[in-house]
Amino acid sequence: MAQEYLDFELPIAELEAKIESLRSVASQDDEINLDDEIARLQKKSAELTKKTFANLDAWQVSKMARHPNRPYTLDYIERIFTEFEELAGDRAFADDKAIVGGLARLDGKPVMVIGHQKGRSVKDKVKRNFGMPAPEGYRKALRLMQMAERFNLPIITFIDTPGAYPGVGAEERGQSEAIARNLREMSTLKVPVICTVIGEGGSGGALAIGVGDKVNMLQYSTYSVISPEGCASILWKSAEKASTAAEVMGLTANRLKELNLIDSIIEEPLGGAHRDFDAMAHNLKQRLLDDLKELEMLDEDNLLHRRYNRLMDYGYC
């Protein structure tokens, strides 16, 4: 996968291009030793990356959440879980590829894992509908959650969508009903539910698999009722005000943690999750294991009571 860079990463990209050029020259001639120069540039690149990412604004974080190289649900499933067995279809209409899910093991423990899935190639993006589920996607997710409840399996969800698909067909098949039903049913599931925003957390399309006992966010993910561009178009009649909208929307992990709307912020590798899939997966896995250990100590009544109180606290100052 070719590395892509965002606008504020371009100075870093220039340094890394120089490093690759020197490596190429050195590999073609054994008599040329460029190790010292390469090491100097690598140190400079690391320092610049650290400085760049030390104080990203909300708009830059929004861009990071959408980074085309960012790991998706299946990337994490491959690195965190074993024996993953994908389950398909909502048993009513179709199998929506924008949501994937199935049985797996987390450190040997059986779990149900569900998440939004975007595509990499043009063909895969179309197949996955750019990570925007239709009603059948949410109904598939609910089917798997109810299956997990029957077999007393913890549920782990990964959220990464710009929003539910707003097409005519999706509306005709009951998009709003599918989302609303998921919200209701997830609030009363009798097994632990751990939700993590790994990229974009867009509106009801994200919330439909986001009601849980623990809600976490990756460091450079976002969670909001609308995109910054959409908000800017409504309030300022111009999508060019997206950066301003991002600042006032409070969509970053840090801001949502301040508001007690999420439980934990999972640190990303220097430069973002896309720089090191394995390191990011390691951090995420540890968070999931810690959360699961805590939740498994609760009996069913306490689990549901705590989840109910959590939901009732939303919106209070």
From Swiss-Prot:
GO terms for molecular function: acetyl-CoA carboxylase activity; ATP binding; carboxyl- or carbamoyltransferase activity. It comes from the Bacteria. Gene3D superfamilies: 2-enoyl-CoA Hydratase, Chain A, domain 1. One of its GO terms (cellular component) is acetyl-CoA carboxylase complex. It is found in: Cytoplasm. Pathway: Lipid metabolism; malonyl-CoA biosynthesis; malonyl-CoA from acetyl-CoA: step 1/1. Its EC number is 2.1.3.15. The keyword NADP does not apply. Pfam families: ACCA. It catalyses: N(6)-carboxybiotinyl-L-lysyl-[protein] + acetyl-CoA = N(6)-biotinyl-L-lysyl-[protein] + malonyl-CoA. The keyword Protein biosynthesis does not apply. Keywords: ATP-binding, Cytoplasm, Fatty acid biosynthesis, Fatty acid metabolism, Lipid biosynthesis, Lipid metabolism, Nucleotide-binding, Transferase. Residues 33-294 form the CoA carboxyltransferase C-terminal domain. Its main location: cytoplasm. GO terms for biological process: fatty acid biosynthetic process; malonyl-CoA biosynthetic process. HAMAP family: AcetylCoA_CT_alpha (MF_00823). Belongs to the AccA family. Acetyl-CoA carboxylase is a heterohexamer composed of biotin carboxyl carrier protein (AccB), biotin carboxylase (AccC) and two subunits each of ACCase subunit alpha (AccA) and ACCase subunit beta (AccD). Component of the acetyl coenzyme A carboxylase (ACC) complex. First, biotin carboxylase catalyzes the carboxylation of biotin on its carrier protein (BCCP) and then the CO(2) group is transferred by the carboxyltransferase to acetyl-CoA to form malonyl-CoA. This is Acetyl-coenzyme A carboxylase carboxyl transferase subunit alpha. It comes from Pasteurella multocida (strain Pm70).
